Amino acid sequence: MKFSESWLRTLVDPKLSSEELSHLLTMAGLEVEELDPVAPAFDNVVVAHVLDVVKHPDADRLNVCQVDTGSGAPTTIVCGAPNVAVGLKVPCALPGAKLPGDFTIKIAKVRGIESSGMLCSAKELGIAEEASGLLVLPSDAPVGQAIRQYLDLDDNLFELKLTPNRADCLSLLGIAREVGAITGAATSLPVVPEVVASIADSRAVVLDAPEACPLYCGRVLKGVNAKAPTPEWMKRRLERSGIRAISALVDVTNYVMLELGQPLHAFDNTRLEGAVHARLAKPEEKLLLLNEQTIAVDADVLVIADDVKPLAMAGIMGGEESGITLETSELFLESAFFAPKAIAGRARRYGFGSDASHRFERGVDFGGARRAIERATQLILEICGGQAGPVVEAKAVLPVRKPVLLRTARAEMVLGLPLGAERIAGLFAGLDLSFVCEGDNFQVTPPSWRFDMEVEEDLIEEIARLYGYDNIPSVSPRGALKMQVQPEARRPAYRLRQMLADRGYQEVVNFAFVEAAWEADFAENVAEAELIRLANPIASQMAVMRSTLFGGLISNLITNLKRKQTRVRLFEVGRTFHRAADAVPVNGFHQPWKLAGLAFGGALPEGWGSGARKVDFYDVKGDIEALLAPAVLRFEKLAHPALHPGRAARILFDGRDIGCIGEVHPEWVQKYDLPQAPVVFELDFDAVKAANVPAYAEVSKFPPVIRDLAIVVDQNVVLQTLLDGLKGQVSDLIQDIQLFDVYVGKGVPENKKSLAFRIVMQDTQRTLQDSEVDAAMQQLVSCFEQAFGAQLRA
């Protein structure tokens, strides 16, 4: 929101400097982004009247001018401006004047003729970036008056960076209210008398979509002179607010929007047919807008139409065919309230925006529509003449402002201030809030222009703003801190992160909303209908809540590969999102924490002491086992859409499924153009944080006995299944069984494979005898034979 300080001070004039006012607004939540003077410093420049112009005898591009500067005698000035002419009133810098750029005007001879001053352009005065000639002033400009005074150049431009909830401050009226409430200064708000109708002409208004447009005011004006010039004071205020002056009728609607915060629109009444309707667009309806863009209007877009055709996108932009021109003499003036939900996002959908949509989608004072149309009528009649008909008002159910309870004790507790009910009542009165006191509590009814007061915390914020954030004392919080004992059965999250970092992994943090394609490629058992889609995504590629962390890690890998990183280790801890009927704390959704990782490139960093080898399934499996040690994990074959069908496993801990590991599926390796298949894993983070409490076990002082055993089994026998079959079936002397070789080929029958195991046997009380070892080995072989049809390899 941009405006001039002089305009604001006509409504409220606190005894503060510009800088003090800027600081006060910022500390009250209305951040002043820029505070700039309208014009740079200069002096001794006055309004001058050009009396005579003759060509310079010695220069083709120069003129010798006789100028009245109000001193009583004509002044000779040599001027090279192409637009200098007799009768013009222009700025004149007198001798001794200091112009922007540290340029001092002196009496000097120009090609033999003495020049006592300089006629100035807007650029030379520093009030415009470009200028093609002298700054021409209105014919009634008083000769001799200081140009700074005449053009009101001792003014400042404020630009506020407003938050979306403060739509009430998108007008001078709203800002004046705020300044008055903050400073206690008296406000002189615009008095808008009702314009008495002088003609009976009117046009019926029909609310076909009352929820989107519950209030519409319209008025016919006739005999209007659209070519009448806009007053200089209005043009100046508009331009200093960042709005270009166009024509008197357009300028009036823009001026009222800035002054009162109510966007208006003017239609050429002769181009309308029948009643005016506020309705939703019809199928295949098209509209040529004022920006010369033709759009196909969607069915959820509110339009203003007559009985035959659409006229405008309601609250956004008017149509070209019903727009006013300099030939317009009869107009239909609109002032309406459009519900924010009916306007929000519609302009962006078509790739443009407007000052009107910026206000309506945030919320416009529904109590100010009638006042705005009266104010605009008043200005149009003063500037353009004409006659006004009666205001036709169509009204449905307007928003109901529900009272909000404020407890004084609650406000004092949140702010840490001993305010008292009387002080709070004074602050609310300064904001023009309607309230009822019930002891130390308040029932506050928000005004029609405040859409941001809905809960008690909103009112506490208002108290803090008016009291002054910088007046609230800084008090350090105090509390009795109790040392929290970390249970042995839980691993702290920071320790798990540190362990992964120690193994060469780097932590990443990705958005929880992802591409729908990632879910299709990497998610397990998630149908298209089960995707959790965002109602209003920030981008099309961020439209779905993730159910797996794999997609983000693959995207991170691609980014690293583009930056020539050949060895990548990544992990992420984050929530995933799943539909579940009984999930808490969010009904219908389960949001578990997951730990996922990715390894790509060499198994080890390049070095002279080790050969180059690509990371594989077993490297990452070892990382997971080290992370969860001393827990013993089980790995079972797994079919997963994201993983290689023969190089993927489900991870189980104490019989519970806690995640998966595997190479990325070849189809996705090809689709995402990866040089090799990365190995990924995803674990239930809560399960990973669970730890086995260490228990004492005696270390044997007697030597172990190691035997090797090779058996032949069917090709389809899975190692884990084979080891599971031994539990409880073999001697207690056997401490460990490790697979050290798998062989298929010569000497092994077809469809068979040879598995070689290293058996470690030991007792804590004595040295084992050969007979005991032989018996244990025979028992082991018998188990292999009976359970899996295994045979000793010859």
From Swiss-Prot:
PROSITE patterns recorded: B5, FDX_ACB, TRBD
Cofactors demanded by this protein: Mg(2+)
Protein origin, superkingdom: Bacteria
Biological process (GO), any one: phenylalanyl-tRNA aminoacylation
Xref: SMART domains: B3_4 (SM00873), B5 (SM00874), FDX-ACB (SM00896)
Catalytic reactions on record: tRNA(Phe) + L-phenylalanine + ATP = L-phenylalanyl-tRNA(Phe) + AMP + diphosphate + H(+)
Enzyme class: ligase
InterPro entries, alphabetized: aa-tRNA-synth_II/BPL/LPL, B3/B4_tRNA-bd, DNA-bd_dom_put_sf, Fdx_antiC-bd, Fdx_antiC-bd_sf, NA-bd_OB-fold, Phe-tRNA-ligase_IIc_bsu, Phe-tRNA-ligase_IIc_bsu_bact
Keywords, comma-separated and alphabetical: Aminoacyl-tRNA synthetase, ATP-binding, Cytoplasm, Ligase, Magnesium, Metal-binding, Nucleotide-binding, Protein biosynthesis, RNA-binding, tRNA-binding
This enzyme's EC code(s): 6.1.1.20
B5 domain segment(s): 399-474
Subunit structure: Tetramer of two alpha and two beta subunits.
Protein name, as recorded: Phenylalanine--tRNA ligase beta subunit
Lineage summary: Bacteria, Pseudomonadati, Pseudomonadota, Betaproteobacteria, Rhodocyclales
Gene that encodes the chain: pheT
